[in-house]
Amino acid sequence: NVTWKNSAFWVQIYDQCENLNIDRITVDSKAFWNNDGIDIVDCNGVKLTNSFFDATDDAICLKSHDPKSICQNIEVSNCVARSSASGIKFGTASRGGFRNIKMTNIKVYDTYRSAIAIQAVDGGLVENITIDSLHSYNTANVIFLRIGERYEGEKAKLNNVTISNVYAEVPAGKPDAGYEYEGPVEDLPRNISPASITGLPGQYVTNVTLKNITIVYPGGGNPNYAKVGTDAKSLNAIPEMPKAYPEFSQFKELPAWGFYIRHAKGITFDNVTLTAEKPDYRPAIVLDDVHGGDLENVTINDPGKKKNEIVVFQSTDIKK
């Protein structure tokens, strides 16, 4: 029952703590750009429950600053998050990594970037992540899973992620319009970005299950504004960007409106529904360098009615 309001930087940071319980807190901090709502860094055994976050920067953020440590055994439940960055974020600092993280019953709204961003970009291990019961409204992106290599030679791993029971609505306009510190308009030109799971060549995101997922997109992708096709030349031209700061929009225009998956193994879609409210020139899903994928239980509602809504390129063992 504690309220924090308008910090000058990160509102609160818990660094290398053990057996920490945080319950019924309120964060209302929109005074400056770097107002993370809460940062849990290289901790072991944290429970964050029944709390509300309205923050300019990432609302609920897990970090790992120490390559010899790890952020693990974290439970977050019954929380509401609003941000001009991401609602729930693993990273960007991910030196040691994240393990055994469970998040349940989370609502994200009016959020400029991602509802869920899981980033392994600094050489750490990210594994055994469970996200269950997520409701996301007026948020620019729903799911962003990313392997990067910001420190050359430090290979990260992202393995065993389950995201289930999600309902999300992606708006056509800017989700945080009208807030005092809005997220910066960047990575243009691009139409509405899809959810994405992206590794690197030889560094695969592995074993991801998406179950009972419904995402409603505005559609309306206009090829005269920005266009990436699904031919080999166009798909191969999408940059890898291993050292770039990871954001769902970093690739600019992507060739799918629903999901873009590249450099991944063991991807399962189980009862996933993707809806575009207006015709979009792009297919719903593009798989590139994906090996082992089950997309048989996918429903696509596209007023454009394309013959091929799931494009498979340079991939093997894909069921659709």
Residues covered by each model-derived region:
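Extracellular/periplasmic carbohydrate-active domains that bind, remodel
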Residues: N1-K320
